[in-house]
From Swiss-Prot:
PROSITE patterns: TLC. GO terms for cellular component: endoplasmic reticulum; endoplasmic reticulum membrane. PANTHER family: CERAMIDE SYNTHASE 1 LOH3, LONGEVITY ASSURANCE FACTOR 1 LAG1. It comes from Solanum lycopersicum. This is ASC1-like protein. InterPro entries: Lag1/Lac1-like (IPR016439), TLC-dom (IPR006634).
Length: 303
């Protein structure tokens, strides 16, 4: 049964995942650029000019290319911060009262006699997936046609594509429970990342110490993600899988999904190296940042 059916309004209703559910994904993919355009024009532009130039200097004659770039990049980070905050709240609303929020074993068993991969999803979990899937579908195109071209463009594109594939695959192969926790892990640290970047663009270096970013990145992406989430998807799931019933599809689901999850771990480590370098530079400069976060410098080929 697809998400467009009436039962979608009942968030606790359980049903098996279906390709029909993805009928709403294009709606979200169109929703995000529409909202971003309105926020860019009526909110972010004014806020950026106020914070970057100061009160009474929002309109500057003979505006330089550097100032225009700072405004554009500030608006990009403001938009991402708004999305990640909304997605984090959504993910917590969906997962907080579920048994697998605190016990990874319930990724694979329950409720009742349901055992992975024969598990149903609640409508609220399906909605979270379509919301996030729509954003990353839009983000792939935004990175090409809308965003400032940065030196880590290839890595960012790989991340967006891998995330979009993970969302589609994990949904259809019944990995959505663990997937919702992975989404919550990523969104939490990304909120602090975008706040730090906005503070850099606005010249508020004291706010750009990235202490919360570093702390959340270490705890969520470098400790909890590999030692709890990946441990559960690599080992714990094997203890519950009916190997006789799922001789073919079980191993296929297992290896494909875990390969993508480990690719995300590699990206976590890569970005942590960049964040760590920035942290060291900030300490040496006594709180001042000479560069930006996570390879945020412009591509040398940008006009």
């Amino acid at each position: 049964m697809g998400l467009l059916e009436g039962t979608f309004l009942d968030w606790e209703y359980e049903s098996y995942p279906s390709y029909e559910d993805f009928a709403v994904l294009p709606l979200f993919a169109l929703f995000f650029p529409s909202v971003r355009f309105l926020l860019d024009r009526f909110v972010f532009e004014k806020v950026a000019r106020r914070l970057i130039f100061g009160k009474g200097q929002e309109v500057v004659e003979n505006e330089t290319d550097d100032r225009r770039r700072r405004i554009r990049k500030f608006k990009e980070s403001a938009w991402k911060c708004i999305y990640f905050l909304s997605a984090e709240v959504f993910a917590l609303v969906v997962t907080y009262n579920e048994p697998w929020f605190t016990n990874t074993r319930y990724f694979w068993v329950g409720p009742g006699d349901q055992v992975w991969p024969d598990q149903m999803y609640k409508s609220k979990l399906k909605a979270l997936y379509m919301y996030t899937g729509g954003f990353y579908t839009y983000s792939i195109f935004a990175l090409i046609f809308w965003e400032t071209r940065r030196s880590d463009f290839g890595v960012s594109m790989s991340h967006h594509v891998a995330t979009a594939i993970l969302i589609v695959l994990s949904y259809n192969i019944r990995f959505a429970r663990v997937g919702s926790v992975v989404l919550a892990i990523h969104d939490a640290s990304d909120i602090f990342l975008e706040i730090g970047k906005m503070s850099k663009y606005s010249g508020a270096e004291a706010l750009a110490s990235f202490r919360y970013l570093c702390l959340s990145w270490i705890i969520l992406r470098l400790i909890y993600y590999p030692f709890w989430v990946l441990w559960s998807t690599s080992y714990e799931v094997l203890q519950t899988l009916d190997k006789e019933k799922h001789k073919v599809d079980g191993p296929i689901y297992y290896y494909i999904f875990n390969s993508l999850l480990f690719c995300l771990l590699v990206l976590h480590i890569y970005w942590w190296v960049l964040i760590y370098r920035m942290l060291v530079k900030q300490i040496q400069a006594r709180g001042q940042l000479s560069d930006d976060v996570r390879s945020d410098s412009e591509d040398e080929h940008e006009d």
